[in-house]
Design a protein with these regions (language model features):
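Active-site His/Glu-centered metal-binding helix of metallohydrolases
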Residues: 153, 157, 161
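Hydrophobic alpha-helical transmembrane segments
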Residues: 1-149, 162-251
């Protein structure tokens, strides 16, 4: 993923205008950046898979497995969540918990209390369950290793370019919207899996579904469609009443 980040930075450095230009031109340059990154990642991954084919079934399977592995982040999700949990529950260390949360979210965490640190952690894990686990698997099953890696490139561009600030307001808009589209179906699959998990754990899954259907059209401070969906779905399953005290800087 570091290589994808470097590739994004390379194209951004070459396509981001040095002088002020029109909003439309900024958007087109950002869109071109996205398309070039996706094309490059797709071609390189396809070439790698082709080499695997030449080496036989076992080499192809090994390369495909490695590609899928690098597009998923289940361990980091669990590690980050548990670390913040223990900082709050065992150590009562709000300062370190705020700092640790700031590493995994694009939000202002400096003044959060214990309750809102917990909420922020749950929201982030709920969202990242989609883009760190379900979406890569979804596109791997549909389009193979190339699909999973192209998805990861699109998601990484959203995290690097999809900010609502002066630099990326128009340049990063295409990247942000593309990420919404890519995660539209996987986000809903994740919700169904959350409901299934709640059912198996004998939690109140019916209430979670009711709240989800009730609030599905409720706008949140974040314009990021997938983020809003997964925050609501995941937190509902976990019986957390979200408060919009966090300041979102993502689309």
């Amino acid at each position: 993923m570091v290589l994808i980040g470097n590739l994004i930075s390379f194209y951004e450095n070459h396509l981001y205008p040095e002088k002020k230009t029109s909003d439309g031109n900024m958007f087109l340059r950002g869109m071109l950046t996205v398309l070039l990154v996706l094309l490059t990642v797709g071609l390189l991954t396809a070439f790698l898979i082709y080499l695997g084919h030449l080496g036989g079934l076992w080499l192809y399977a090994a390369i495909s497995t490695v590609v899928l592995y690098f597009t998923m982040t289940p361990r980091s999700l669990a590690r980050d969540g548990l670390e913040i949990y223990h900082l709050l529950k065992d150590d009562k260390d709000l300062v370190t918990a705020r700092k640790r949360l700031s590493w995994i979210v694009g939000r202002d965490t400096e003044n959060l209390d214990e309750s809102n640190i917990a909420r922020g952690t749950i929201e982030t894990i709920a969202e990242n369950t989609t883009d760190g686990i379900i979406s890569p698997l979804f596109y791997f099953l549909l389009f193979g290793p190339v699909g999973a890696m192209v998805y990861r490139a699109g998601n990484t561009m959203d995290s690097m370019l999809g900010y609502k600030n002066d630099r990326y307001l128009f340049f990063g808009r295409f990247a942000a919207r593309l990420d919404d589209v890519l995660n539209y179906i996987p986000a809903r699959i994740t919700f169904l899996l959350f409901v299934a998990a709640a059912f198996l754990l004998r939690l109140d899954w019916r209430h979670a579904v009711e709240i989800c259907l009730r609030d599905a059209e409720t706008p949140l401070k974040s314009d990021h469609i997938m983020t809003s969906i997964m925050m609501m779905y995941g937190a509902t399953i976990l019986f957390i009443a979200l408060e919009t005290v966090l300041i979102y800087i993502f689309w």
